[in-house]
Design a protein with these regions (language model features):
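A glycine-rich helix N-cap at a beta->alpha junction
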Residues: 164-172
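Glycine-rich active-site/cofactor-binding loop and its immediate structural neighborhood
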Residues: 108-147
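Active-site-adjacent helical/loop segments in soluble small-molecule enzymes
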Residues: 426
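Short, charged beta->alpha transition segments
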Residues: 95-105, 130, 143-155
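Acidic (Asp/Glu)-rich catalytic clusters
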Residues: 152-161, 184-185, 326-327
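C-terminal helical cap(s) of enzyme catalytic domains, especially alpha/beta-barrels
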Residues: 77, 209, 349-355, 399-419
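An N-cap/entry alpha-helix motif that binds or orients negatively charged groups
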Residues: 11-105, 211, 215-220, 225-295, ...
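Alpha/beta enzyme core
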Residues: 119, 133, 175-368, 376-393, ...
Length: 442
């Protein structure tokens, strides 16, 4: 997202960096190859995933790559992209490709944003900041996770000038919801992305088998521990700890390691935190309040009076839910099944997008995530009705393999393949992709 003041030169710079991304990326790789140099990360989706698995711990891999139940929704996401096939067009004279799009009256250098991924400290303690810098370098806005490992304000600063949006999980504490919204506004966020599909955690066997929830070790709660309202809640919990039965913890080496992790991820010095009840109380407060199973449309409708930011509802799969979202004031929806992490055997995000676009028509702003791995996937999503997409696991895989440079290269590769696919399909711009013929759907 480009800031609202003095934006034109910044936007032109970002758009210029993306223009010609395909051939420029190929050229850099092939020229480096003359000297025996190879990319930091594999350029194919399967190779990237395999490399990431080798670089991640078992717990990190389970959380990042795992899905709900038997993984049927994750499989459906990929199968739907395999099933839908572009029909290239010839001799359209596409000398240059324009990847720019407009969302909520703002210009963006490409139709790709980085999806929010929580608990990224599983991969690197500074994962949010490293990813934000990669996003800034590639001109791709980052949707900062509500379950991040660095405070919103620090990550937002690192993401400039590409900009950022902020993801909101609706807490059981309304004052905390308001506090997070105010911080998003103050940080210069381009939109507020309210995640609807995680009012409770889905059944995730990979994490459950390991008994691993990163938040219970203090990972992924930095937006909370940097929030004044939240820390008031923590201190209230400490004062009432005499009647709290959650103090019964079996003393084991793993428990000691978890307490050390809580201390390290809590603000302040680790030694002081080890002697303080705050880190553990912060974790327990989070586990009891971070999501709200009672979230309903009436509550969502209050957002129009609580923020001036564009409001995006993430996690929509049903056409009637999409219609209701816009009726209560959403500016856009993200068609998403949370990367297959919530309901096993649900509809794929791409198939849902087709139905929602057919139901609502061309006007509403629809974004898509879940299942996107390549630039070709982005092109298919745009051709089938998405106005933009959120890219998730691939950039995290790149981060795991080669840090900031790895995340940056993954983003560059996705943009490069998207731009080349546009050229080969005869599309001069993103709007032109909407007219590209796709076979494999009714």
């Amino acid at each position: 997202m480009v800031s609202r003041s003095d934006t034109q030169s910044t936007f032109l710079s970002l758009a210029s960096a993306v223009a010609g991304a395909g051939r420029a990326r190929q050229d850099r790789i092939y020229r480096a190859g003359v000297s025996g140099l190879r990319p930091s990360v594999p350029t194919d989706a399967a190779g990237l995933e395999g490399a990431a698995r080798r670089h991640m711990s078992r717990k990190a891999w389970a959380y990042v790559a795992g899905g709900a139940g038997e993984g049927r929704t994750m499989d459906a996401n990929r199968e739907s992209f395999y099933r839908h096939r572009l029909v290239p067009r010839m001799a359209h004279g596409v000398k240059e490709r324009d990847l720019t799009v407009s969302l909520f009256g703002e210009d963006y250098a490409s139709p790709v944003l980085l999806a929010p991924i929580g608990a990224s400290a599983l991969v690197d303690k500074d994962a949010d900041l490293l990813t934000a810098r990669a996003a800034a370098a590639t001109g791709v806005p980052m949707v900062i996770s509500n379950q991040g490992c660095s405070p919103l304000e620090d990550t937002a600063a690192a993401a400039a000038p590409a900009g950022h949006w902020f993801q909101l999980y609706w807490s059981t504490d309304e004052e905390l919801v308001d506090s997070l919204i105010r911080r998003a506004e103050a940080s210069g966020a381009g939109a507020l992305v309210v995640t609807l599909d995680t009012t409770v955690l889905g059944w995730r066997p990979q994490d459950l088998t390991l008994g691993s929830l990163p938040f219970s070790r203090g990972q992924g709660i930095a937006q909370y521990t940097s929030d004044s309202r939240y820390m008031d809640m923590v201190r209230t919990k400490i004062r009432g700890a005499g009647s709290d039965s959650s103090g019964d913890v079996r003393i084991t080496p793993a428990a000691a390691a978890s307490l050390l992790s809580m201390a390290r991820h809590h603000p302040g010095r680790t030694l002081r935190n080890l002697l303080s009840p705050e880190p553990r109380a912060a974790v327990e407060t989070f586990l009891g309040t971070y999501s709200n199973p009672g979230l309903d449309w009436d509550m969502l409708a209050t957002l129009r009076d609580r923020t001036s930011l564009p409001v995006v509802f993430k996690g929509i799969l049903d056409p009637e839910d999409a219609e209701r979202a816009f009726a209560v004031g959403a500016d856009a929806v993200v068609v998403s099944n949370h990367g297959g992490r919530q309901v096993d055997g649900s509809v794929s995000s791409l198939d849902a997008l087709i139905e929602i676009r057919r139901h609502l028509g061309d006007e509403p702003t629809l974004l898509l995530d879940s299942g996107i791995r390549t630039g070709r996937d982005v092109a298919v999503a745009l051709a089938l009705g998405a106005d933009a997409v959120l890219l998730g696991r691939p950039w995290m895989y790149g981060l795991a393999v080669a840090g900031r440079r790895g995340a940056e290269e993954v983003i560059q590769n996705v943009l490069a393949e998207l731009e080349l696919t546009m050229a080969l399909c005869g599309a001069k711009n993103v709007a032109g992709l909407r007219g590209t013929r796709v076979v494999g759907h009714a």
